[in-house]
Amino acid sequence: MKKITRRSFLAAAGVSAAALALTACGGSKSGSTSTAASTSTAASSAAAGDAAAAANDPKVTLVYAEVNPLDTIVGQTGSHFKEKVEELSGGSVVIDVQASGVLGSENDVLDAILGGSTTIDISRISAFALTSYGCNKSKLLSIPFTFENRAHFWNFANSDLAPEFLSEPQELGLPVRGLFYGEEGFRHFFTVKPVATIADLKGMKLRVSNDPVMNGMVEGLGANPTVVAFGELYSALQTGVVDGAEQPIANYKSNAFPEVANNLILDGHTLGAVQAVITDNAWGKLTANQQAAVMAAAADTQKFNAELSETAENKVLDELRSSGCNVVDVDDKTPWQEACAKVISENTSDQAELYQKLLDMKA
């Protein structure tokens, strides 16, 4: 099938609702997308008990796309999901994790799977990535300074509100469904030249991924948003195409960015919320027992990610400091929040009530 862009997909698909049911952990149908937050311990145990039955089902291999290396938080999360799916399915479902962006950028992967490609079955994406395809609720997860801390985010991810976000793609007729939420830590700016305060960012060329919220945030900080593909970021920093960028701490180190931009300012403008989605085509290949195993593995993986993320990030931060990286703490984030006030208002006013629910979930 011809590859489509986000623009052409939206033009063709419109906003038609699709009430696609998920098979629940016991093999029954549910009218909304099941989530790790709503999957009970009892249901997970039942799915584990079904492993013997699933083991006799036809073997299925699902390709899982991950843009970051396996040693990152999200990479380890993908590896854990693979292990749990294969364990709980009795080996009848095999997850082939393709990491380090070998299958393309996040947008490339989404364009492919939403365009009908059957090469990729599951993708770990930024929680707001589907915003470009009409999922407006997802946009709220990328608004600067929405989540005060990790506990705030996990209050959301484990709440009754999370399924409303995860089910949005299906409600819009997109051929994917959410599996689980996760996070890779707060995102911070890193630069070639030292940065001590927000004022030092003025006039800098900062890499963005052409996301409207990110563009507005960078402009609010007085910098110039510059679109660069993630795979080209290292060389862009090295050659002066951009002066800096932003990433979660673990990704910053794992992608060797300290080699070319050894200054990290801990502004924590957004939490790197992520989710995994599976295509309807892949979901349809699975038997009821296999679907149950996948959802139980998703629930377990969400819990695993929550436990891993903070510990892993603290370890990496200590390593960065020890290696000579110029790490700058930000004690007062008020100037940063004020600089982002415009982009926050512009991107939440149409969903003010829903956004307030997110804010009210702070720990």
List each language-model region with its residue ranges:
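N-terminal secretory/targeting leader peptides
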Residues: 2-4, 13-14, 26-31, 49-151, ...
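Extracellular mucin-like PTS domains
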Residues: 33-47
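Gram-negative bacterial Sec-dependent N-terminal signal peptides
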Residues: 11-21
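Compositionally biased, low-complexity segments enriched in small residues
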Residues: 1, 19, 31, 35-37
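Twin-arginine (Tat) signal peptide motif
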Residues: 2-10, 23, 42
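Glycine-centered hinge/linker elements that transmit conformational signals in sensory
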Residues: 166-167
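A gly/proline- and charged-residue-enriched helix-loop-helix capping module
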Residues: 152-163
